[in-house]
């Protein structure tokens, strides 16, 4: 009667194709993970060799050159490039400025670090970013509104306006409420 293999009916049977597929997929995942690990280990080894070479070569060099090498090594040198150069590129790309032949004929100069100032909070900010902020504040209508509001709040100007309008001074100016 029952000459069939009852193990084929069990979900855990290793002879079933779906179970073989699961095993094969996990093996492939392990193989790809091992390959990724090996490539990462090779990258780490290359970085170590580069660090050793840079350390040996920068022993007798000044501190600023060491900092430049460290930035190049870490891949962050693009963050510290001169903002003036990026502003010119931005203006050209936006169509605000056309390139002159004198600019095109100039040899490429290495980027110079932007001058920094230390603010009251102690954080170093670049001068160009301060110029951008001041330019934005001048163009911003809300900042103009706040400046005029500050000018109105000065006691001398409010008394003068009140006297010119009514002829007698106000005892206390009405407080401006900010919502």
Swiss-Prot record:
It is found in: Nucleus. The gene is CWC25. GO terms for cellular component: Prp19 complex; U2-type spliceosomal complex. Residues 25-57 form a coiled coil. GO terms for biological process: mRNA splicing, via spliceosome. Residues 114-129 have a biased composition (Low complexity). Involved in pre-mRNA splicing. This is Pre-mRNA-splicing factor CWC25. The lineage of its organism: Eukaryota, Fungi, Dikarya, Ascomycota, Saccharomycotina. SMART domains: Cir_N. It comes from Saccharomyces cerevisiae (strain ATCC 204508 / S288c). Keywords: Coiled coil, mRNA processing, mRNA splicing, Nucleus, Phosphoprotein, Spliceosome. Belongs to the CWC25 family. InterPro entries: CIR_N_dom (IPR019339), CWC25 (IPR022209), CWC25_splicing_factor (IPR051376). Belongs to the CWC complex (or CEF1-associated complex), a spliceosome sub-complex reminiscent of a late-stage spliceosome composed of the U2, U5 and U6 snRNAs and at least BUD13, BUD31, BRR2, CDC40, CEF1, CLF1, CUS1, CWC2, CWC15, CWC21, CWC22, CWC23, CWC24, CWC25, CWC27, ECM2, HSH155, IST3, ISY1, LEA1, MSL1, NTC20, PRP8, PRP9, PRP11, PRP19, PRP21, PRP22, PRP45, PRP46, SLU7, SMB1, SMD1, SMD2, SMD3, SMX2, SMX3, SNT309, SNU114, SPP2, SYF1, SYF2, RSE1 and YJU2. The modification Phosphoserine is found at residue 129. Residues 99-179 are annotated as: Disordered. Present with 861 molecules/cell in log phase SD medium.
């Amino acid at each position: 009667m029952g000459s069939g293999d009852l193990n084929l009916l069990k979900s855990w049977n290793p002879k079933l194709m779906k179970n073989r597929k699961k095993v094969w997929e996990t093996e492939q995942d392990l193989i790809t993970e091992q390959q990724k690990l090996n490539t990462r280990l090779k990258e780490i080894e290359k970085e170590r060799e580069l660090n050793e070479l840079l350390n040996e070569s920068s022993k007798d060099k000044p501190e600023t050159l060491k900092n430049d090498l460290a930035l190049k090594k870490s891949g962050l040198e693009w963050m510290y490039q001169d903002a003036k150069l990026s502003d010119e590129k931005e203006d050209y790309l936006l169509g605000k400025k056309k390139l002159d032949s004198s600019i095109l004929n100039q040899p490429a100069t290495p980027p110079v670090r932007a001058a920094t100032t230390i603010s009251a909070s102690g954080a170093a900010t670049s001068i160009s970013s301060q110029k951008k902020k001041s330019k934005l504040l001048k163009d911003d209508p809300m900042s103009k509104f706040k400046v005029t509001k500050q000018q109105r709040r000065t006691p001398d100007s409010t008394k003068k306006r009140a006297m010119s309008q009514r002829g007698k001074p106000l005892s206390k100016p009405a407080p401006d409420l900010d919502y």
